[in-house]
Structures are given as structure tokens and as C-alpha cells.
């Protein structure tokens, strides 16, 4: 099984939004990443549009029409603005392949926890059904908790995205091995229930290979902050290729 790399472009938009010049270009960044071999593009449009804006989502969807073998993943809280943003693309028959539901509060600094079951089940079930009616795959942002995977499966999710910040924070410490073991156990629980496994948050060139090697069945990693930071030094193409090598190392 090959683990796919989806590049999150939020930080490109964040830099662009500090001026009114349109640079750096989000669509240019996407093009360079796709040309370098990235398997997909991820964005997380927040209600305050502090980085990715609704226009960016449309422009990227238009761009993705030229890359039919790659995927467009849109993250966000379906209780806020996500469903409206996605519906706008669906109405125009623009490509979007996966929605990742994230339980962020409005104005939250960054994603920092997953959905809770059974507490969130009644709110999520109709939203997942709506996304499925639009022909989209649904992934739920989840903490590494094997017992919670049954809840994700019960509400109709297709995949879970494991929130990897606890692993990243433990990297290089005595907690690294226990964290990897917990993520591996969670992935096995998800796979046993027929869920696909994605992962993301603070994965980087240092910790990615070990994660891929230890955690079974990871279909996709979504990486933004570290990858864009590396691209400031190395360029988009070299950076994407470096991350693809990390994935290949983890799979070897």
C-alpha cells in the first residue's frame, strides 16, 4: 500500500494575506507541489478567512480539473462554514474528493483535538449523510483512541484522520515509543472496522518515516506547516520530493 501525500496550503495563504499583492500565490504553490509528485492538495478554510479564503477554494478546485489523478481535500468544521463552501463546489461540478470534519471552534488557533463519541454522533450523522449524497468521501479528525473508532464507523465515516501532534511532541523523548504504539493500535482498530486511516498535524521530515513504518495502513498524510516552512529554504519541488522519500523510507 502506498501512503499518499496531500499538501496543506494554509500557510501560503497566511503569508499572502499580510499584503494585498496576491503573492505568494496559492494556486502557483499547488501547481508546483503537484508537478513535484504530491498526490493531493488540502485546505482548511476557517470562518474568519485568516488564511484560505472561499475564493481560494474555488480557484484550487478549478486548478484540480487539470489533475484528474490527484485529490482535493477540504477540512473544516461542518457546523460552521465548511458545508456551504463545499456545496458551492458541488453545485458547479468542480472537483472535491474528500471532506475532513474537524471540531474546531470559531477563531481557534489551530486544530487540537478530535471528535467525541457518543457526544458528537447526532450532529455528525446527518452531515456525513449529506456529504455522501454529494458523492464525497468523509474523514473524521480523531484523537488516537482505539475505543473511539467504533463511534466514527457508526456515524458513517469512511476514514479517520489521526491527530498526530501528541506523537510529534513526543518525538525524541521516552514517550515516542508509547505514542507510536498507541497510534498503531488505533489504526488497527480503525482498519478492522473497515475505516481508512489518514494522519496529520505536526508531521515533518524528521518524524514522518518512523510514523509510516510503525502505523499500519496509513492511506494519506496531510502536511502543511512543516512542509511550507521547509519550502522557504528548499523550494516547493525539492521539499515535496523529500517528503515523498520519507514516506517511501517508512514503507521500505
Curated annotation (Swiss-Prot):
Residues involved in 1-deoxy-D-xylulose 5-phosphate binding: 46, 51, 110
GO BP of this protein: pyridoxine biosynthetic process
Active site residues per record: 44, 75, 201
Molecular-function annotations in GO: pyridoxine 5'-phosphate synthase activity
Record EC number: 2.6.99.2
Main location: cytoplasm
Task performed by this protein: Catalyzes the complicated ring closure reaction between the two acyclic compounds 1-deoxy-D-xylulose-5-phosphate (DXP) and 3-amino-2-oxopropyl phosphate (1-amino-acetone-3-phosphate or AAP) to form pyridoxine 5'-phosphate (PNP) and inorganic phosphate.
Protein name: Pyridoxine 5'-phosphate synthase
Organism of provenance: Albidiferax ferrireducens (strain ATCC BAA-621 / DSM 15236 / T118) (Rhodoferax ferrireducens)
Amino acid at each position: 500500500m502506498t501512503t499518499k501525500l496531500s499538501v496543506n496550503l494554509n500557510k501560503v495563504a497566511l503569508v499572502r494575506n499580510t499584503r494585498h499583492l496576491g503573492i505568494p500565490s496559492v494556486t502557483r504553490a499547488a501547481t508546483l507541489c503537484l508537478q513535484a509528485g504530491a498526490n493531493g492538495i488540502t485546505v482548511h478554510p476557517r470562518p474568519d478567512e485568516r488564511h484560505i479564503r472561499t475564493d481560494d477554494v474555488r480557484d484550487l478546485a478549478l486548478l484540480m480539473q487539470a489533475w484528474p489523478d490527484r485529490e482535493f481535500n477540504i477540512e473544516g468544521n461542518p457546523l460552521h462554514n465548511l458545508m456551504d463552501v463545499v456545496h458551492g463546489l458541488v453545485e458547479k461540478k468542480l472537483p472535491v474528493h474528500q471532506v475532513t470534519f474537524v471540531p474546531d471552534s470559531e477563531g481557534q488557533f489551530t486544530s487540537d483535538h478530535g471528535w467525541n463519541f457518543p457526544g458528537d454522533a447526532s450532529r455528525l450523522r446527518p452531515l456525513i449523510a449529506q456529504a455522501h449524497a454529494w458523492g464525497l468521501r468523509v474523514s473524521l479528525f480523531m484523537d488516537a483512541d482505539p475505543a473511539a473508532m467504533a463511534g466514527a464507523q457508526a456515524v458513517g465515516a469512511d476514514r479517520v484522520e489521526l491527530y498526530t501532534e501528541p506523537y510529534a511532541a513526543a518525538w525524541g523523548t521516552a514517550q515516542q515509543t508509547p505514542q507510536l504504539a498507541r497510534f498503531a493500535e488505533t489504526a488497527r482498530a480503525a482498519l478492522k472496522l473497515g475505516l481508512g486511516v489518514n494522519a496529520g498535524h505536526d508531521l515533518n521530515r524528521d518524524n514522518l518515516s518512523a510514523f509510516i513504518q510503525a502505523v499500519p495502513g496509513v492511506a494519506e498524510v496531510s502536511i502543511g506547516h512543516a512542509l511550507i516552512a521547509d519550502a522557504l529554504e528548499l523550494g516547493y519541488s525539492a521539499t515535496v520530493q523529500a517528503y515523498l522519500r520519507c514516506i517511501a523510507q517508512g514503507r521500505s
